[in-house]
Amino acid sequence: MAAMTVQLDIVSAESSIFSGLVAHLQVTGSEGDLGVMPGHAPLLTHIKPGMARIVKQDGKEEVFYLSGGILEVQPSSVSVLADVVMRADDIDEQAAAEAKRRAETAMADAGADFNYAAAAVELAQAVAQLRVVETIKKNIAR
């Protein structure tokens, strides 16, 4: 018996990153982790910077970094719209670690005119990228 699937499209501001049938999608929603499977109730929600993990129709898993965005679930399709989407293999671990360090330093040395919100977003994105890299490393080590 074939696995139940749903059409998933992951789109960035620049291009379509993934389009295909999936058995499962997991993202970080505004209220925590969110799993979507075929037959999920319709939904429209914000997603936070983090990982999108998909299980494709053939059972293979793929991981992406999302900078945040919108998740729309319809009866026959799921759409993820994000400003930035990166395949896990394309993340520059050193650049993400440096961005994290810069944001932490800026927040620690903040003055009166410091844009805390922008630094917090940069920090959240860098930490999310590093989590995606760590997840991939753990999966490879298995």
Curated annotation (Swiss-Prot):
Belongs to the ATPase epsilon chain family. GO terms for molecular function: ATP binding; proton-transporting ATP synthase activity, rotational mechanism. It comes from Shewanella piezotolerans (strain WP3 / JCM 13877). It is a peripheral membrane protein. One of its GO terms (cellular component) is plasma membrane. This is ATP synthase epsilon chain. The keyword Zinc does not apply. F-type ATPases have 2 components, CF(1) - the catalytic core - and CF(0) - the membrane proton channel. CF(1) has five subunits: alpha(3), beta(3), gamma(1), delta(1), epsilon(1). CF(0) has three main subunits: a, b and c. Keywords: ATP synthesis, Cell inner membrane, Cell membrane, CF(1), Hydrogen ion transport, Ion transport, Membrane, Transport. Produces ATP from ADP in the presence of a proton gradient across the membrane. It comes from the Bacteria. Gene3D superfamilies: ATP synthase delta/epsilon subunit, C-terminal domain, F0F1 ATP synthase delta/epsilon subunit, N-terminal. InterPro entries: ATP_F1_dsu/esu_C_sf, ATP_synth_F1_dsu/esu, ATP_synth_F1_dsu/esu_N, ATP_synth_F1_esu_C, ATPsynth_dsu/esu_N. It is found in: Cell inner membrane.
